[in-house]
Structures are given as C-alpha cells and as structure tokens.
Regions:
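Cross-family detector of peptidyl-prolyl cis-trans isomerase
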Residues: 1-148
Length: 148
C-alpha cells in the first residue's frame, strides 16, 4: 500500500497499516497483515509543529496540515507526526473504550500482548473517500483473548 493520503490522517481512532523500519523497508511499504489503532493525545503547538515538520520533510510544500486537522488534533487528539508515513485505512466509530483496554493489556519484551487479543467482528459502514481501491471504515467490537 502507498503511504499517506491528505484526506485521512492520524486522529484518535484511526486504523493504519504497520510496516517494517526504514532500514529494511526503504520503500515504506505497509504490512498486509498488521495494523494499529491510534490512541494518541490532544496536541499542543509543539506536537502540531512536529507533525508539520514531518509532512514538510516527506512532501515539501505539496502537502500541509489543514486547519481542520489542527483543530481535530487539539480537541480529539492523535499522532500527527505519523501523517504521510503510514497508510490510514479506517476508523473506529464506536468502542474506543475497548481499544483503550487493549492498549493496557500486559505485553512482553517485544511489546506484543502476552495473551492474543482478537477482533472478532468488524462492520463495514461505507467506502472511504479518496481511495482508488475499495477501503472501508471498521467498527471494533468486544475483543476476545485466548491463551497461547
């Protein structure tokens, strides 16, 4: 997957494709099987500036942070420093309390949950604008853990 579309950014609750580090993945290709859900935090001027600088580094003047993005990051939160570097493909529309519980599960030395956390059901709400291929919003439902 190609990284970064300006219409969709790393606000709280977005789903994005993970990827290997730049040193082993210089083309920044996204994983087809791993993703993350943005928790992030409400951003101040310093956090927004970090996001702006990253966009400038990646895209020059061809892609900038909009006023809508800034306001969303200030009021809802997110991770603006990831914009343009990872592919955002969906959004949690309900169940962020469950996502926060997942964030707090016990993890091993590789930052992986000690017990698997599985999303059993995701609901397609609508196609997301701006994508050539069909991309969808997803609703995260109650996670189920199983012993390894």
């Amino acid at each position: 997957m190609a990284a970064g579309l300006p219409q969709i950014f790393h606000k709280r609750g977005t789903l994005a494709a993970a990827r290997e580090p730049d040193i082993v993945n210089p083309m920044h290709e996204s994983s087809s099987s791993q993703f993350y859900i943005v928790i992030g935090k409400k951003q101040d001027d310093k956090g927004l500036e970090r996001g702006r600088k990253n966009l400038q580094k990646l895209f020059g003047d061809s892609l900038t942070m909009t006023k809508e993005m800034e306001e969303t990051y200030r009021t809802i939160g997110g991770t603006p420093h990831l914009d343009g570097a990872y592919t955002v493909f969906g959004e949690v529309t309900e169940g962020m309390d469950v996502v926060e519980k997942i964030q707090n599960v016990k993890r091993d030395e590789y930052d992986r949950p000690v017990e698997d956390v599985r999303i059993i059901k995701a609901t397609i709400l609508k196609d997301m604008p701006g994508y050539e291929k069909k991309q969808v919003k997803r609703t995260v439902k109650k996670p189920v853990r199983r012993k390894r």
